[in-house]
């Protein structure tokens, strides 16, 4: 029996670097040692990506995951030929590309909900292309949340063992500050802890970052820590959660990277993004927690400016596949 986890990998926007990085990642034999990769995309686009990148691989279009060979040298592919190859252009925002990317995601979700794949790893998509296709989502997390019926799924970054959650994401900084409430922080402490346990961590140590310089120095310059964050942390501790904070944001991520904490709850988008990407930009992986299955993703965009040149690095996608494979077994046991 093959015990390697079966990972469904979406090709991403077909006009982007997604097909090229998929080709490069699946040319790496290490990926096949870790998992059984199943690409979900378009065989015609992938054939073009093979030419562009110069990789020597065979395509094996399949109707179901059970038909895959999962051996290095052959790319098993759920084939969804929904784009017009005559009009598809590298590096351009196109409605048909946005619609195709959404179709790949939707099929990956169906396979995961059926239990046909153990986890999903996603390639890059473009928000403008989704909008052009009249698909009313701003990103992967929202799509996965809606199509799985999951309430407010969590985003977690993993960068070489450093794990970061986000209390707020795609809102203005002013709005993010207004959203830092006792109830929201407490809810996220509970849910982040549950997510870490689902990944196999036992009694995980969670640190909550502060908002203001030096955590506001007891209200001298900003009172969000005293008014909202500290009461939430104290309530969570009373409930038995292994949480501490608020910790100064200029040092808490370093302490987590050194192993003092299992994860950090950052308070707004750039607070966590800067920490992760400065630590290792290419190896930052996004994980969506709070879904019925595990989802990992590259943490970069479609890079239209270099699409079709063969220059795009597959490091982030390879790392996303590795992380998905690493956590798949533990996630399956706790589901």
UniProtKB/Swiss-Prot annotation:
Keyword Oxidoreductase: yes
Cofactor: a divalent metal cation
Presence of keyword Methyltransferase: no
Record-listed substrate binding positions: 140-141, 277, 295
Highest taxon of the lineage: Bacteria
Cofactor note: Binds 1 divalent metal cation per subunit.
Enzyme class, UniProt record, top EC level: oxidoreductase
Enzyme nomenclature, EC number: 1.1.1.408
Cystine crosslinks: none
Binding-site residues, a divalent metal cation: 170, 214, 269
Record-annotated membrane-spanning stretches: none
Record's catalysed reaction(s): 4-O-phospho-D-threonate + NAD(+) = dihydroxyacetone phosphate + CO2 + NADH
Family: Belongs to the PdxA family. PdxA2 subfamily.
Subunit and interaction comment: Homodimer.
Known function: Catalyzes the NAD-dependent oxidation and subsequent decarboxylation of D-threonate 4-phosphate to produce dihydroxyacetone phosphate (DHAP).
PANTHER family, sorted: 4-HYDROXYTHREONINE-4-PHOSPHATE DEHYDROGENASE (PTHR30004), D-THREONATE 4-PHOSPHATE DEHYDROGENASE (PTHR30004:SF6)
This protein's name: Putative D-threonate 4-phosphate dehydrogenase
